[in-house]
Amino acid sequence: GICTSGTDVAVSTIGYICEKMHLSGIPYEAAKILTDKAKMKDAFRQGGVSAADGMRVRSAEEAQKAAEQLGYPVVVKRVDSSGSRGITVVEHSGQIEEAYENARNGSARDYVLVEKFLRGTEIGVDGFVQNHKLVFLAPHTKFVYRGAHTTVPVGHAFPYGCSGALREEIARQMQLAVTASGADQCSVNADVFVDGEKVWIIEMGGRTGATCIPELISTYYGFDFYEQMIKSALGEETDFQQTESCPCMAKLLLSPVSGTITQIDRDQVERLRQEGLELVLDYPEGHEVSAMADGTDRIGHVIVKTDREAELDEQMKRVYRCIWIDGKNLETIWEEKTAK
């Protein structure tokens, strides 16, 4: 079997292999649709999915015309990247050319997507599809950070509190997106906007989300989500039955500045872990880190069993005190950044 988690990089390859080798997994055509935001937009439109209006463009001039037609603000997107890369929110015409170049650079396509900017609350929705039907649905709160070009997801929380009517509409729109894309025998992850009981599916991936989502699903629902993904890929029977309900949340460890990790207080890190904190550090001392621009700039993560963001943030501060960038404590660096 073959599957992936948290990235679109391998999804098309997985679809191709599953098709050629008759394995359990995402169909190749669905994989191609769900790794190209423009193709996805076309499929959603044809499938009646509630989504933002958008247009495919091949030049800055076409992007300008599309933005004028859609009405500002718009979002200019690289069509073949995930993790908020190549995405810019554009407020006026003077920003279009730079946004277009940001989207085109690093893309294997000769077009980008210009999309109407939606207002509302951004949430995440993960699920699992079997026999073309959603058999598991997990909406969750999304923590975002406003980057240079767009908002960047930096964490998630379970459960997402909402009315029964809103949950039903989320499920309905997700199923429409699944049907429109042809996704099957795979996990899905969607960026969703809600306003009252109105739901828009911004985009959907044919794999589970990143930023600790599988770990949080496992913690909240009481089953190992990674195990169920692997079982599905192997063609084995899966079980998404919730066995417990443990509120939990996570955030990425990030740096607002580029530099080198000069010190990690390993003794304190171990004490925090012994207290029950789920703490992962990606890099050792001496490793260079980048100022956060998207989720790939993470230097670790923290998971806490709580329903209070303030409690998570306090634990994040304790971890940041353990890390030094270019001789300065990371908690201090963040305090100086937010004070500006």
Predicted features along the sequence, with ranges:
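Active-site nucleotide/adenylate-binding loops and adjacent lid/helix of ATP-dependent enzymes
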Residues: 33-113, 119, 131, 160-176, ...
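Short, flexible turn/loop "capping" segments at secondary-structure junctions
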Residues: 76-80, 150-151, 292-297
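Glycine-rich phosphate/pyrophosphate-binding beta-alpha loops
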Residues: 84, 205-221, 285
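Phosphate-binding core of ATP-grasp and ATP-grasp-like enzymes
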Residues: 103-111, 116-160, 168-201, 205-213, ...
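Peripheral (often C-terminal) accessory segments that flank ATP-dependent C-N-forming ligase machineries
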Residues: 230-340
